[in-house]
Amino acid sequence: LIYLLLSIACSVLLGFIFKLFARFGVHTFQAIMFNYFTCLACGWLHSGNLPFSEADRGEPWMPYALLLGLVFISGFNTAALTVRYFGVTVSQVMQKMSILLTVPFAILVYGESSGAAKLLGFALALCSIVLVNWPASKQQTTTNNGLGRLWIPLLTWVLAGVIEMVFVLVQHNRMTDQGDPAFITTIFSTAGILGLAVCGFGWASGRFAFSWRNVAAGVVLGIPNYGSMLFLLMALGSGMEASLAFPLTNVGIILATTIGAVWLFEERLSAVNWWGIALAVAAIVFISV
């Protein structure tokens, strides 16, 4: 459980760092790209090895790591588009709703436990995710976007689910039960290389402006980003079922982020939001039974 709590803490810290980017004039995509190479450095310091070595190329997890690197970059881009066209609330809800894919996948494909308490907790978790993210006032989201752009939030949801399902697959095939840093750094390296290609085109075309501020932001972002994935894999490797780990992680992140936002950033919550927090606590209790 301690590994799961550490993963949640790192993920919450990521959200707070993102919230500060606009205040300090950070270019989000460039910071994300530099964050991936920071994660690579963390993996090198942790394991002493760099990705794509001759030994790593023969590992059974290599194709999955390459796939995840691509999905990471794609998921970030679609999440950013969702924020642009539908708002932050829709983007966050669609990403957290990935448990609608992950939990049934773990239960149906791998036969993980699905008792009444877990199913009730699963339902409460879904309700809490929606209520905690419920806007305090009406916000313009899909009004002027039409049906032509509905694929953007739907793709955000699907990609978030794909990431978690691949982790479930890797866990059940005992490829990285102990959070192999080579597996993690390969994922981030693949995403970083793809991101560097995009940034390189942006710099060459003049669409992006290089700034050391973005490099520094990427370093600050990369350390907890690496930790969030490492500790999640270690939690799964310790024997915790994926159908338990992912809902707890998603609900825990929303719960901790909401409370932190109220204390640190003085964000106001509606009565509906507080009901969502209460349901999140109840969901954690039922899922943990």
Which residues are covered by each model-predicted region?
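C-terminal appended segment following the main domain
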Residues: 2, 227-289
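Membrane-interface interhelical linkers
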Residues: 1-66, 76-85, 136-154, 186-238, ...
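Hydrophobic/small/kink-forming positions within alpha-helical transmembrane segments
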Residues: 8, 12, 44, 69, ...
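Loop-to-transmembrane alpha-helix entry segments
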Residues: 95, 111-131, 150, 263-286
